[in-house]
């Protein structure tokens, strides 16, 4: 998207993938020779490499990106002895199948799912030993949409602007993971320390989100904000890492003119011409031309909400 242009195209789009045949692997740091890899036997519809993102570049048009639930990825990394900022995999809905070429410790967090190392069952939220050559299978998410996988040593693809995260909107970072990829692994970090945690589960009922009105609430009719805070919305099946679309009572505008393109932040609730709110997630654009009626404090739970989930907004607690 060109700098200074209003973001009026559909903000929810497919991740960019390079043309041509399946690529044999991702380059390791500094293009060095990679010996230990994680082989991808089945990638699923959207599996990406993610860490905690690349903050500090919004003024250059680069969003933070990174894991949609940073706490879930950080927990997975702690469970295997990695730094919390190490890169892992974000797996969407249908699971994946992987095979390491060296013995590793792995941890899966996020949605509840079947996890197996060969024939041996494992658990979400606990470290698992995977011998060299064994197959790790992560089944479909039973609640929520996504899982995060940490592997001892981390996924050591080449960083871009200090991060290994895939940005599906701009194409920065490694491409989305595909069948047959060989993902380089970093050095073994040593045995994982004991971690005493309670693993949270994605919300399965009505989702309540705190909304801070503005900066363009005055572009809407007086009852639009009351409608947003007083009526339920439903998560649409049209959504991805860029944004979560909601359907419900349309939010009518009081100002019909064009809004000059301005900055967009994580959690911004933009209202396109159809009046249906769109909540921007990690791969959001940094500028937009539709008015933003408010900003959601924490989008991690929304990123796990399945289509059909009921969402209610409420104002900040005083």
Language-model features, listed with the residues they occupy:
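Conserved "landmark" site that anchors the functional core of diverse proteins
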Residues: 1-318
């Amino acid at each position: 998207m060109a700098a200074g242009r209003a973001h009026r195209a559909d903000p929810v789009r497919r991740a960019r993938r390079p043309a041509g045949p399946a690529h044999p692997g991702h380059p390791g740091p500094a293009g060095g020779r990679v010996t230990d890899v994680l082989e991808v036997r089945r990638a699923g519809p959207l599996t990406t490499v993610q860490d905690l993102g690349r903050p500090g570049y919004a003024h250059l048009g680069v969003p933070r990106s990174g894991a949609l639930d940073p706490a879930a990825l950080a927990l997975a990394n702690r469970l295997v002895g990695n730094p919390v900022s190490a890169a892992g995999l974000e797996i969407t809905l249908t699971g994946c199948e992987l095979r390491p070429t060296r013995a590793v410790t792995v941890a899966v967090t996020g949605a509840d799912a079947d996890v197996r190392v060969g024939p041996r069952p494992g658990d979400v939220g606990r470290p698992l030993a995977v011998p060299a050559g064994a197959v790790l299978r992560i089944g479909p998410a039973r609640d929520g949409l996504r899982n995060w996988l940490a592997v001892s040593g981390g996924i050591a693809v080449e960083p871009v602007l200090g991060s290994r995260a895939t940005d599906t909107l701009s194409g920065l970072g490694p491409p989305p993971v595909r069948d047959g990829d060989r993902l380089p692994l970093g050095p073994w970090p040593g045995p994982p320390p004991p971690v005493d945690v309670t693993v949270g589960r994605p919300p399965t009922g009505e989702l309540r989100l705190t909304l801070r009105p503005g900066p363009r609430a005055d572009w809407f009719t007086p009852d639009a904000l009351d409608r947003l805070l007083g009526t339920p919305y439903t998560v649409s099946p049209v959504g991805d890492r860029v944004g979560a679309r909601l359907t419900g009572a349309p939010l009518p505008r009081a100002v019909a003119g064009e809004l000059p393109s301005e900055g967009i932040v994580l959690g911004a609730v933009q209202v396109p011409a159809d009046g249906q709110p769109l909540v921007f997630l990690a791969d959001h654009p940094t500028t937009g031309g539709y008015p933003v009626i408010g900003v959601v404090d924490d989008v991690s739970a929304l990123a796990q909400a399945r289509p059909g989930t009921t969402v209610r907004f409420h104002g900040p607690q005083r």
